[in-house]
Swiss-Prot record:
Described function: Shows a broad spectrum of activity against both Gram-positive and Gram-negative bacteria. Also has antimicrobial activity against S.cerevisiae. Has insecticidal and non-hemolytic activity.
InterPro entries: Poneritoxin
GO biological process: defense response to bacterium; defense response to fungus; killing of cells of another organism
Location of this chain's protein in the cell: Secreted
A GO MF label: toxin activity
UniProt protein name: U1-poneritoxin-Ni3b
UniProt similarity note: Belongs to the ponericin-G family.
Organism phylogeny: Eukaryota, Metazoa, Ecdysozoa, Arthropoda, Hexapoda
């Protein structure tokens, strides 16, 4: 479900760092 996806996303964010988070958000908006 989406909760599992969200949990994976949070773990991925912690691993990759805030720079990639900003890039992902920018891509999602477009």
């Amino acid at each position: 479900g989406w909760r599992d996806w969200l949990k994976k996303g949070k773990e991925w964010i912690k691993a990759k760092g805030p720079g990639i988070v900003k890039a992902a958000l920018k891509a999602a908006v477009q």
